[in-house]
Amino acid sequence: MKKIFILAIILLSGTAAASAQEFLTINPDVRTAGMANASVATTGGAYSVFQNAASSLFSHNLFEVGFSYSPWMRDVKKGYDLMAFGGFYSFNHKHSISFGTRFYREPKLSPDDEDYPFIPKDENNNPIVGIEAFRPLSVSADLAYSYRIGRYLGLSVTARYIRSSYGELFTNNALGFDVAAYARIPLNRMLEGAWVSAGAKISDFGFTFDDSNYDLPTKFSVGGSLFAPIRDSHSLEASVDLGYRYSSSENKSFGMGIGVEYVLMQMIAVRGGYHVADSHGYDYGTIGAGLRFMHLELDFSYLFAAKKCPWRNTYQAVSYTHLRDH
């Protein structure tokens, strides 16, 4: 009973925007983070397993791997950190295996920290004594398989194991799944090298273990993207995402993100985007930049929003390597 009560205190705390399960909603791909998180139909990359694994079938590369770091919600409290590793291997663009893992750290918890909302208390609302200070940790491990049907369509299924630990208090475990589709149609008759794509995904539906009250942030997303080469070494990609997030709690929201990426000389990328949401979400803008040198790509993004948005002034950094081309 005590364990269930403590869990309820944590899940109902309104001052923390990213609870144990909500780290799954943070986009670890810095490239699309700079495009207002419009990612379900964009060009596939190392982080496709978190966005739309089927898009990896249409990548120019047969193998990509990447690492990203996101110091999250610094305006709320220091100590929220997301680290992610992702990649894929494509078998002649007919089959692909995508993989990834995420580590999400929250600020240190201590019963003596009176200004922190996650103070563990008993049924009488008294702080529980004898509990050592600790940093909550959430981890996910992802594995996806994608299959290409014909020239234009790819399908994927992703399995995800999630574990959130609150020290000696309790541990939550869950298993989630994604199902996604990605289609790309070339527009060579209109412009050589141009294409249009569409994507759809249902993410993070599944079940929990250990009779926990874990609430997976199930989401349905659809989107489209247009890629157009400009001159010899320049290109433009514009993307839009529509998403509806559903959970059994009151945390339901609808949002739309629009993002643009301009690449100069196939080396320097400039990105921007804006996301709008209903009354249950937040509006925000993003900017980003990228630099590619040989097989190494470095990216940066920054999120700006009104003071009420806990994600404002968040930046993300990433480096990843393309190890094998066609």
Which role does the model predict for each range below?
Residues 4-13:
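Sec-dependent N-terminal signal peptides
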Residues 19-324:
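Subset of outer-membrane beta-barrel
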